[in-house]
Amino acid sequence: GNEEGLRDVAKESMNIGSVYRSYLQDLYRFFKLHPRKAQFDDPFKRDQLFTRYTVLESMLKTPAYLREMASFLMKREYYQDAIAYMEEALKHETADAETLQKVAFCYQHTDRPSKAIYYYQQADLLSPDNEWILKQMYLCYSALGRYEQELDCLKSLEEMNPGDTRLISEIGLCLMQLERYEEAAQRFYELEYKGERVVPSWRAIAWCNFKMGRLEQADKYYRKILQQDKVTWEDYLNAGHTAWCLKQTTEAIAHYRNYLQLYRSKRKDATQPLLSPFDEDRKELLLHGLNDLDISLMRDILQPEPES
């Protein structure tokens, strides 16, 4: 009899919790979705952490409820509101890896990667070698331009997934950001050998060799790229730089004119001067032995007629 009574009490308690949740969720849907919602004062537009309201505090200030409400908000991509619930839950219970991951994920999706990293690092301590956490951390480090830390995360992931071509590519790109072009090129040679992501790898190999002053090797790869179907204006521009630095001026001009033709149709901002990408690379050209007079003369040759 006592056992049945305890079961009934537990069942009733669970039912009360379900009623609370259902009631609040129905309220939320009403104030957010009802056709006449504009006629009512929406309490959800104010402080979303209901536990700060005295009348609701005793009912709602439980970690289980706070976590559940946070998950409800996360699914609907109300990340800032979800953060408030999860951080409140963390005040009342020992942090676990899952909750920390969720807080970090919400910060990541509200464009606060530094705060996201703070929580991902805590989650990583509780759940070491978690691939999902490492992946999110490297994305946050990349967004912050913290490429050394991004590289550490990527290499940890690579140890767990040897031979993963996507990771090889990401590591190569990260090494390029760090201006470690020799190491980066080796990563892309590996992809070329595997027959994976071939044309993007050629682009990276060509640019790494250009940056290292290995112009003949860069030229070899740009020639291969320009024989492909989907050539970009960047391909023509970089091939032009390489040819010009090799003193193949006629060929360089031909590549530059192809770049201008493609860039005219592909640029996102029609007011952007057609030669602005060329001008942005002035420093690279100077480093490879050209001078300001050379560059000014080339600009005069390439200068397109004013657009109507």
Give residue ranges: language-model regions:
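TPR/TPR-like (Sel1-like) alpha-helical repeat modules
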Residues: 241-267, 295
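Alpha-solenoid helical-repeat scaffolds
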Residues: 1-127
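Conserved structural position within tetratricopeptide repeats
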Residues: 88-91, 121-125, 155-159, 189-193, ...
